[in-house]
């Protein structure tokens, strides 16, 4: 009888232990389940927040599109204006460069031409002296012929470079191209007329190299 009771007690103890163990296991499983469910719910909420967009305001969208169009139009106009300005600057630069080249060429030619003028003056003086000498002797001087030929070639060359003489008489005095060396009273001439050329003047491409030295009537 005692043995039976003892066995029963032992069984009860084992059953209680088993029940306690099972409860603990159930609690652990429930806790894990609850934790997992919470995580799933949190993830769902996050996904929902990310996926579901805010309510769209179509008026704002229209305003944004209109502003973008205006900005794009302004940018296009600005770029177009910039291109036009650059083209104008390039054209002006080319014109200035061409003008500077021409100016440099004319300036170099001007200096060279001015250096030639005394040579031409000396040839003309020599020619005039020889002509007067030959009139007295009534002889043909070969030196005179050589001087004449040389002078003709010089004149031909300077004409080819755009140099022209100022040597006309009986025209109105012009202070822009004439320098009055003396004034004479001549009743046969109009007042302020070029009566005589003492030294020729020269013009290069419309620009005065040297004024003509003249005698003027009064």
Curated annotation (Swiss-Prot):
Its main location: cytoplasm. InterPro entries: GrpE (IPR000740), GrpE_coiled_coil (IPR013805), GrpE_head (IPR009012). The keyword Chaperone applies. The keyword Membrane does not apply. Gene3D superfamilies: 3.90.20.20, Head domain of nucleotide exchange factor GrpE (2.30.22.10). It holds the Pfam family GrpE. GO terms for molecular function: adenyl-nucleotide exchange factor activity; protein homodimerization activity; protein-folding chaperone binding; unfolded protein binding. GO terms for biological process: protein folding. Belongs to the GrpE family. NCBIfam families: PRK14150.1. Participates actively in the response to hyperosmotic and heat shock by preventing the aggregation of stress-denatured proteins, in association with DnaK and GrpE. It is the nucleotide exchange factor for DnaK and may function as a thermosensor. Unfolded proteins bind initially to DnaJ; upon interaction with the DnaJ-bound protein, DnaK hydrolyzes its bound ATP, resulting in the formation of a stable complex. GrpE releases ADP from DnaK; ATP binding to DnaK triggers the release of the substrate protein, thus completing the reaction cycle. PANTHER family: GRPE PROTEIN (PTHR21237), GRPE PROTEIN HOMOLOG, MITOCHONDRIAL (PTHR21237:SF23). This is Protein GrpE. It comes from Wigglesworthia glossinidia brevipalpis.
